[in-house]
Amino acid sequence: MAVKPKDRDLIETNEGLIFCVVGYLHPPDSYTAYLKYVPASEGKWIRGETVYSRVIPYYHVTQVENTYNILKDKYSKYLFNCPVRKIVVSSVPRENVLRYYRPKERLNSILREGASDTLEEKLVTLVDLLKDETGVSYSDLGVTGSILTKTHNPSFSDIDLTLHGLSATNTIRKVIRDIRRANSKLEPFDDRQLSEWCSDRTKNFPLSFDDLRLIAGRRWNYAYYKKTYVSFHPIRLDSEIDEAYGDFKYFPKGSVAGTATISDSSESVFLPAIYEVVETDTELDLDIKQLVSYEGMFSDICRAGERVEFSGVLEKVSGRDNFNQVLIGGSGSIGSYIKLV
């Protein structure tokens, strides 16, 4: 059976464009993905004789939607009016894929063939550290980002690790927290970096500095390793992908805001993050089943039993089951958020 497409896989098109796969909901003949790098005359990322520039400076719904303008002007075939989600998304048809990059395969290649530069050497020692500290296997890990496509630059590139499966993620998450707390091999943000992180995000989210400090205190999936920024990205296994394209249809119904109590946060580690909720209170007096966030900042920050405030797009969902959900960080959800109350 073919391996299913997964969040954080990368795709190179016949034109040399590089897209990043988003989530797990993909049409049979294409991949839902956003444009990340394009060949250019000038840029910081280089592979062979090809120079790339990054068209999305950071992942945010506004930045993703800005890439649609680039595609509309030159590559309209990569814009798809999705009949399941009832929105326009960027998507790469299978027939236009020159190369499909999988994080686990790339890490396995580096481990097998040896590191080719100082950044890859750091990657190998970091993976060995996690393996030794947690007991997970190499097959539970992968590497995405510029290392995946061999466009990285050791002088400034980050390490973006993928953690495969909920079980491995839960094991690694605890150990990362413990190691960071000991301030040893994995270092957390210092006070200055934490303040800068919060200040920067007050510009993009309707949240206060104090709201963001609380969120930052819950985030575990980042660290510095030997002075290199490292991010950790949980990825579903094939067996954990339980929705096929067309099982449900999603109907946007406008903006909604309110409060709710988290009943289950176990699937909030993935992208999209899914929070099951109860006791919802909105101006529309609706029963809402879940909050679904494509904004990674809101992943795994809420616990069962906690009360949260939210703002996003109300979606009516029909299919195997019928329910309401709130979309955060997706198309049309500018200004959406989740915060603890």
Regions found by a protein language model. Give the residues of each.
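Catalytic core of pol beta-like nucleotidyltransferases
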Residues: 1-143, 147-156, 164-341
